[in-house]
Amino acid sequence: MRSRHVSVVINAEPARVYDFAAEPDNLPRWAAGLAKSEVVRRGDELLVESPMGTVTVRFVPRNGLGVVDHEVVLPAGDTVLNPLRVLAHPEGAEVVFTIRQLAMSDDEFDRDTQMVEKDLAQLKSLLETAGPA
């Protein structure tokens, strides 16, 4: 199984980036690879319409370490852990997302990587404009 670390540097304070990325209601604004619509809360779980169908998302508890890991339970019942970190960077914050190939073909892995790159670019765009607080 291969892993890839996809990252983007965002010209914003790490705490601001973390707060935005860790807020589930913001997922549809930046994570099109995961959320195509509003997030529905069911206890600690979140239901999201994704390109794969309805998925359940569970985030780690908010923390001061910049960890925004989340599990995604796919429609078939498989659970995928998505490690996501917000790190301090000389130019603001660096967001690092780890993608694991698991049972994906090489082409699927490449497509998944491209989706994550687009999502992180959207996150950067949102946070480097005057939009979100």
Go through each PLM region and give its residues.
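Short, surface-exposed coil-to-beta transition loops
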Residues: 3-5, 53-56, 78-83
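Structural motif
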Residues: 11, 42, 62-64, 89-91
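Beta-strand/loop substructures that line and gate deep hydrophobic ligand-binding cavities in soluble
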Residues: 71-129, 133
